[in-house]
Amino acid sequence: MKAKVIDGSRASARIREQLKERVACLRARNIRPGLAVLLVGEDPASQVYVRNKVAACEQVGIHSVTERYPSAWTENQLLDRIASLHGDPAINGILVQLPLPPHMSAHRVIEAISPLKDVDGFHISNAGLLMTGKPQFQPCTPYGVMKLLESEGVSLRGAEAVIVGASNIVGKPMAMLLLAAGATVTICNSKTRDLAGQARRADVLIVAAGRAGIVDGSMIKPGAVVIDVGINRSPDGRLCGDVDYGSAAKVAGAITPVPGGVGPMTIAMLLANTVEAAERSAI
């Protein structure tokens, strides 16, 4: 059996076309969604991610502002800049690119962003709303995964969903969204005793551990849907996910590639959250 490839680039393109229409409706009312992206330091991967986000904003008509600061910048300077953006009516969303330099607390910085402009969905207020089933902004990667599953017609009601990875950014919010969709959810972490056994139970397997090849084909139920959230570099420099694609694709019913799977959806949902923030501000 050869798994169907779940094309995140194609699904994200459809979402961007829909967002263009929503932006056009806002522009007709003299409103243009705006996103501020703050980058501290010179992490090469972060610079690539920021460029991709800015290009995506331009594609759908979102006004974006990128502010780059040296790694020597202090946390208080960053917090002051965030506070000033709260009062800017042209900015609907504020994104601080992670990771931050070691001398800065990501928690304090994220909590300094107004929940109304927290388009990453990381603020504790937005996490709490997600927990209660009434999200204001859904974290972009889990949101993108849900949209991918929806685009493939995957039924989650009653399905066994297993998540490998329990981070605040992906694993935990992913569990909340799957629960809301009616799935029975298991989260595996670094202390899970029988990862392979847990993974084999999954009708839908979502892998977000940050470790290349942590899941291979022997750990997958035949016909399962496999979503690979990981992004790593192989020893020869190639991008690869957390799933060993070659062996997994022989067993799974459908699988996301890396790159071209979840990544484009994460950016698309950032745009969606920014447009949503602009629409709310216009009410």
From Swiss-Prot:
InterPro entries in UniProt: Aminoacid_DH-like_N_sf, NAD(P)-bd_dom_sf, THF_DH/CycHdrlase, THF_DH/CycHdrlase_cat_dom, THF_DH/CycHdrlase_CS, THF_DH/CycHdrlase_NAD-bd_dom
Domain of life of the source: Bacteria
Catalyzed reactions: (6R)-5,10-methylene-5,6,7,8-tetrahydrofolate + NADP(+) = (6R)-5,10-methenyltetrahydrofolate + NADPH; (6R)-5,10-methenyltetrahydrofolate + H2O = (6R)-10-formyltetrahydrofolate + H(+)
One Pfam family per UniProt: THF_DHG_CYH_C
Molecular function via GO: methenyltetrahydrofolate cyclohydrolase activity; methylenetetrahydrofolate dehydrogenase (NADP+) activity
Gene Ontology CC annotations of this record: cytosol
Region forming the signal peptide: none
EC id: 1.5.1.5, 3.5.4.9
Residues at which NADP(+) binds: 165-167, 190, 231
Keywords: Amino-acid biosynthesis, Histidine biosynthesis, Hydrolase, Methionine biosynthesis, Multifunctional enzyme, NADP, One-carbon metabolism, Oxidoreductase, Purine biosynthesis
BP GO annotations: L-histidine biosynthetic process; methionine biosynthetic process; purine nucleotide biosynthetic process; tetrahydrofolate interconversion
Biological pathway: One-carbon metabolism; tetrahydrofolate interconversion
Family: Belongs to the tetrahydrofolate dehydrogenase/cyclohydrolase family.
Subunit organization: Homodimer.
Function: Catalyzes the oxidation of 5,10-methylenetetrahydrofolate to 5,10-methenyltetrahydrofolate and then the hydrolysis of 5,10-methenyltetrahydrofolate to 10-formyltetrahydrofolate.
Annotated protein name in UniProt: Bifunctional protein FolD 2
Gene this chain is encoded by: folD2
